[in-house]
């Protein structure tokens, strides 16, 4: 099986063409491939499938390193867009794809950055898969014997965003996994720790559901900006500084889609016997 190794700001992926290749991945196989000592090593596996709808170009599937399938990965979406053009699966710059929960438009720019229409952020607890009686801008949670104030939003996957004074000292490794599997998130969640520098600039670290802390989380950056704007802390255009680099996020507010722009880097192509 042929594959490519790619990354988006250090969030790394194994990307596989299932349009011209016949492939199947069991959870056990994914866990084996994701091992950084005995396998390829990656945060997520991205699979390019033929479209389920003739109006679309491809179907986009995402698997975490633990073998679980998820509905969204923003950094992966950028790598997906560059991959299908690099492999001559399409020559379009505007690429329409379906995911487990919806549709996305991926636009490859002249400098090979990728702009992703992430859709409209959804703050409805039922859509976020968060146990709450009603929509709130800020929720109070008990976790790890402390009170946590957070915002929750779905970007196609569930996110919890916590404001911190400094991401350098944020309890990502301790509080992250506790909140990820908190009883109020029955399907688990991605946990973002956001430091607001000013209305147009934040720093962010994310503990990703099924993957742990990564160098960058695209949907997490989108979620943090959406929550920050909804709480009145941020402007419509925000630079998000992650461990692996920067993303540009823009959102005009309710009724409008949110856009993410950033790089996608090809590392190498490989072949593996399964």
From Swiss-Prot:
EC number: 5.1.1.7
Site feature: Could be important to modulate the pK values of the two catalytic cysteine residues: 159, 208
Alphabetical GO biological process terms: lysine biosynthetic process via diaminopimelate
Site (Important for dimerization): 268
Keywords, ordered alphabetically: Amino-acid biosynthesis, Cytoplasm, Isomerase, Lysine biosynthesis
Gene Ontology annotations for the cellular component aspect, listed alphabetically: cytosol
GO MF entries: diaminopimelate epimerase activity
Annotated binding of substrate, by residue: 11, 44, 64, 74-75, 157, 190, 208-209, 218-219
Catalytic class of the enzyme: isomerase
Active-site positions on this chain: 73 (proton donor), 217 (proton acceptor)
Pathway: Amino-acid biosynthesis; L-lysine biosynthesis via DAP pathway; DL-2,6-diaminopimelate from LL-2,6-diaminopimelate: step 1/1
Pfam families on file: DAP_epimerase
Cellular localisation: Cytoplasm
Main location: cytoplasm
Gene3D superfamilies assigned: Diaminopimelate Epimerase, Chain A, domain 1
Catalytic reaction annotation: (2S,6S)-2,6-diaminopimelate = meso-2,6-diaminopimelate
UniProt superkingdom: Bacteria
Family: Belongs to the diaminopimelate epimerase family.
Subunit field text: Homodimer.
UniProt xrefs under PANTHER family: DIAMINOPIMELATE EPIMERASE (PTHR31689:SF0), DIAMINOPIMELATE EPIMERASE, CHLOROPLASTIC (PTHR31689)
Free-text function comment from the UniProt entry: Catalyzes the stereoinversion of LL-2,6-diaminopimelate (L,L-DAP) to meso-diaminopimelate (meso-DAP), a precursor of L-lysine and an essential component of the bacterial peptidoglycan.
Protein name: Diaminopimelate epimerase
Organism: Sodalis glossinidius (strain morsitans)
């Amino acid at each position: 099986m042929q594959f490519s190794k790619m990354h988006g700001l250090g969030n790394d992926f194994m990307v596989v063409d299932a349009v011209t290749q016949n492939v199947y991945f069991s959870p056990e196989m994914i866990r084996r491939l994701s091992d950084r000592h005995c396998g390829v090593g990656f945060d997520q596996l991205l699979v390019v499938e033929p479209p389920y709808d003739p109006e679309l170009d491809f179907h986009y599937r995402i698997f975490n390193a633990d073998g679980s399938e998820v509905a969204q990965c923003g950094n992966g979406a950028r790598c997906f867009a560059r991959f299908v053009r690099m492999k001559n699966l399409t020559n379009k710059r505007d690429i329409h794809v379906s995911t487990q929960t919806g549709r996305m438009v991926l636009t490859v720019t002249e400098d090979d950055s990728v702009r992703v229409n992430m859709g409209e952020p959804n703050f409805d607890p039922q859509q976020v898969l968060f146990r709450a009686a009603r929509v709130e801008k800020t929720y109070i949670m008990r976790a790890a014997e402390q009170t946590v104030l957070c915002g929750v939003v779905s970007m196609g996957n569930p996110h919890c965003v916590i404001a911190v004074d400094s991401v350098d000292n944020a309890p990502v490794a301790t509080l992250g996994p506790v909140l990820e599997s908190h009883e109020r998130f029955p399907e688990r969640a991605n946990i973002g720790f956001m430091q607001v520098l000013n209305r147009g600039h934040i720093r962010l670290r994310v503990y990703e559901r099924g993957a742990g802390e990564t160098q960058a989380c695209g949907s997490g950056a989108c979620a943090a900006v959406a929550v920050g704007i909804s709480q009145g802390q941020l402007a419509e255009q925000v630079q998000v500084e992650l461990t692996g680099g920067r993303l540009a996020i823009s959102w005009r507010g309710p009724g409008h889609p949110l856009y993410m722009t950033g790089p996608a880097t090809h590392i190498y192509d490989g072949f593996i016997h399964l």
